Amino acid sequence: MKEFDARDYNPKQWAKEAKAAGMKYVVLTAKHHDGFCLFDSKYTDYKVTNTPAGRDLIKEYVEALREEGLKVGIYFTLLDWHHPDYPHYGDRIHPMRNHKECGNENRDFSRYTEYLYNQVEEICTNYGQIDIIWFDFSYDDMRGEKWGATKPVSYTHLT
């Protein structure tokens, strides 16, 4: 994180080019499986505002799209390999999925999903209208209500 400066991050230029290309919306990853947040979440320190970039990149992105009249899309993964309660043993894409030392003992999935819901609520309330939200990832027995999917989806109607 100490080298992440986002010096080439230019959502205003991207938005202008997207509009010129005839695009109607753009989707940016707010958080991917590694758990690093491009927004200023109050629920983790693993975020862009704790890097040399030092600013909320999602906020800049949302503002740039709106200036160009484009719809705002956010990609947000359900997985967070960085969170201590995320159950990575059995996740078929986690880099340490087959290592017994990364077992799920002492992991509290309800605590993890509360963290997940809190971050989704931040995305859906801190940036105004989000036109598209793409919740990524389910696998094997980790589908739908195992994640409590209706709760984060309900936040999309708050704005």
Question: What are the residue ranges of the model-derived segments?
Answer:
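Mature catalytic domains of secreted/periplasmic carbohydrate-active enzymes
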Residues: 1-158
